[in-house]
């Protein structure tokens, strides 16, 4: 029987404070006939906030590493961070593992071929594509970058309410948390 890395998240998508559980994945975006760019995004499951995202012409370990490093530079992680991903080679690569290990992060993996284990991130991509990306045809990565910025930074984090946040946006939920602990 084949063994797989452990799923430590077990579909527990509602941590009780920020920077306890982050999830990540990739999606592709067409920029012409058989041409794609790849978006890697990291969400904080407490608020559903997209805390880091990057685009690249390659879906590789460098994109995963760059996105994780961006998230770590933006956020102050205290205590143990659980980082959940699928079992893609990018997330098992030596250079990615080094960032995980150097930052004492616990890495959790979805079961192979089971997207429900990463449902929050999958839903984020679904709505990004439905509301923004699939409405246009892109010729280059710069145009995708502009629309991703518009959706993620201007709309999603600021104006998109979530039932998991009791109707609050990701930024409102985090603001309420940090104001309450002052």
Regions of interest found by a model, annotated:
Residues 15-51, 57-58:
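An active-site-proximal beta-strand-loop segment
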Residues 47-53, 107-110, 134-135:
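Short small-residue beta-strand/loop micro-motif enriched in glycine and branched aliphatics
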Residues 56-66, 92-109, 113:
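Surface/interface recognition patches
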Residues 49, 77-81:
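Short, surface-exposed connector motifs at secondary-structure boundaries
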Residues 85-87, 93-96, 107-129, 140-147, ...:
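RNase H-like two-metal-ion nuclease catalytic core shared by retroviral integrases
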Residues 1-18, 114, 169-178:
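Basic, flexible linker segments flanking DNA-binding modules
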Residues 101-105, 129-182:
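C-terminal domain-tail junction helix/linker
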Residues 35, 54-77:
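Active-site beta-loop-alpha junctions of metal-dependent nucleic acid enzymes
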